[in-house]
Amino acid sequence: MYGQPQKKIEGKEKKNFFTNCSISSISTEGRLMAINDKYLVIPWQKPGYINIVDSNNPTNLLQNNNIFKTENSNILDMEFSPFNSNILALCSENNSVILSYISEEITNFNQSNCYKSHKNKVSFVNFNPIVSNLMCSSTSYGEIHIWDSSKMKPIIEFRLSSPNSIFWNPNGSMIGISTKNKFFYIFDPRQEKYIFNQQISHTMSTSKFAWLDNGSIATIGWNSNGNKYLYLYDIKRNEKPYSSILIDKYTSPTVPFVDQEMKLIYSVGKEESYINVYDYSLEGLKKCSNFICTETNHFSLLLDRKYLDKNSQEVDRLVRFTKTKNIYLFVFAIKIKTLNLNKWLIQMKT
C-alpha cells in the first residue's frame, strides 16, 4: 500500500443505546439479536419469546410491551431479509425456520411460513443476498439445507461436521462454513461440491469468518504457539493465507466483521473489551486503530452500511450486547492521513 493514503479510524461509544436487555438464557453460536433501519429484535426471557422495538428510539427494554411468542422452544439464530425490512427469519430448537412479518407500528407479528425439513434443532439461518426466495440453514449436527422460501421445500441437502457459522458470499453463488473442528469450507451449489477447505486454527478455540469479496475470506485462528491471528485467504488458491497479522494472545473467541466498501476489518472478542480495526488490500493487512470499550463484549453485529447516518462522517456502526445486559452503539468515522501526498496525486492522475 506504498504511496496511498493511510486510513485513520476514530471511534466513539454511545452508551445507553438500549438498556436492561433481559435476553433468554440460551447457549448458541447464532446471533443473539437482529437489527436494521426499523427494528431491533432479541430473544426475550422465556424460550420462544422475542422483544421487538424501534431501532431508532433507544429505550429501557423492560418497559417495552411489544413482546411476542413465536413457539415453545429456544430461538438460536435470527436475520432480517435484505429485501424487506419487515421480514424476519428465526430458527429454533424445534427443528424449524420461521419466516415472520413485523407490522410497521409493531402491533402485530405474523408468522407467515415455516420450513420444517430439518431433522434436528436449527442453529443458523441466512437469506441469499441476491435471490429473494433462496435461503440456507444448518443444524449444529451438520445437516445443511439450501431451500426455496416460496415453496418451503429443500433444493440441495448436504452434511458437514459441527458448523459454527455459515454465510453466503456477496453475490450469493457460494456458501462459506466454519466448523468447531477448526476447519473452513466453501460449498458451490452449482457444482454441489466443496471447492475449498483449510484448517484455520491449531488450538481448542473455535473460529469464525467473513467474506471480503466473492473470492477471498477473512478468518481468525490460533497458531501452534497459541497466538491469535487474522488471516486472509484467496479461495482460488487452496493453500496457506496470503496475509496474516497478530491480534493478541488471548484465547477468547473473536469474530471478524468486514466493510467491503471501505476495505476495513473489525475484530471483536467475546468476553473482551477490545475492538481492533484493520485496513486490507491485495497487498495485505495493516492495523489502523484499536479501541477499549467501557464494558465487556458478549455479542456484536456490524450494521449494514445502507443504514448509516448519511449526514455524518461515520463509516460503520457496531452494535454491542454487553455482559451487563445493555446494548451499546460504537460509531466509527474515518480520517485520511496522507503519506507522500504529491506522489500519490501523480499516481492517481496517471
Model features per residue range: what roles?
Residues 1-61, 288, 307-350:
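Acidic and/or Ser/Thr-rich intrinsically disordered tails and linkers
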Residues 40, 87-88, 134-135, 175, ...:
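Acidic/hydrophobic-patterned starts of short beta strands in beta-sheet-rich repeat architectures
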